[in-house]
Amino acid sequence: MQLTELIETTVTGLGYELVELERTGRGMLCIYIDQPAGISLDDCEKVTRQLQHVLTVENIDYERLEVSSPGLDRPLKKLADFERFAGSEVSVTLKKPLDGRKTYRGILHAPNGETIGLEFEGKKGEAAMLDFTLADIDKARLIPQVDFRSRK
C-alpha cells in the first residue's frame, strides 16, 4: 500500500478528510486534516496517535510526524472542496495562461458537473466569469477572511 493511501485510509477511518500530505527531505511527515466542524487540538492528537501506530506497524521510516488543520488559506484540490467552499473568496493559479494571465482571485461558484466557475473583476472593472476544470488548475487556495472587530 502506498504511503498516501495508507494515511488517507487511516485518517478517513477516524472520520476526517486528508487535505494534504507533505514529506520533507529531512524525514518529516506533515499531514493536514479537516472536517466540516473544523479541527481541534484533540482531533490532531487523536490522528497523530493512530498514525504513529500504523506507521510503526507498516515499518514506514520517518523522523517527525506533524498533524494539523489546513489553516484559513487551505488548498482546494478535489471537486468536493470546490463544492463545499462555493461562495468563498479564492485564489486560483492555472497551469496555462488564459487571456494573458494565470492567477485569478474571486468568488467561487459551485461546480456544474466537472466545470468550476470563478467570478472575478475583469480588465475594465466589470464582473467576469472564468470556467475551468480540476485539470486546468496548478493550485487553488481559500483567501482568509479575518474580522478583527470586537463582537459586542
UniProtKB/Swiss-Prot annotation:
GO terms for cellular component: cytosol. It comes from Burkholderia cenocepacia (strain ATCC BAA-245 / DSM 16553 / LMG 16656 / NCTC 13227 / J2315 / CF5610). Keywords: Cytoplasm, Ribosome biogenesis. It holds the Pfam family RimP_N. It is found in: Cytoplasm. This is Ribosome maturation factor RimP. Belongs to the RimP family. GO terms for biological process: ribosomal small subunit assembly; translation. The gene is rimP. It comes from the Bacteria. CDD domains: YlxS_C. InterPro entries: Ribosome_maturation_RimP, RimP_C, RimP_C_sf, RimP_N, RimP_N_sf. Required for maturation of 30S ribosomal subunits. The keyword Transmembrane does not apply.
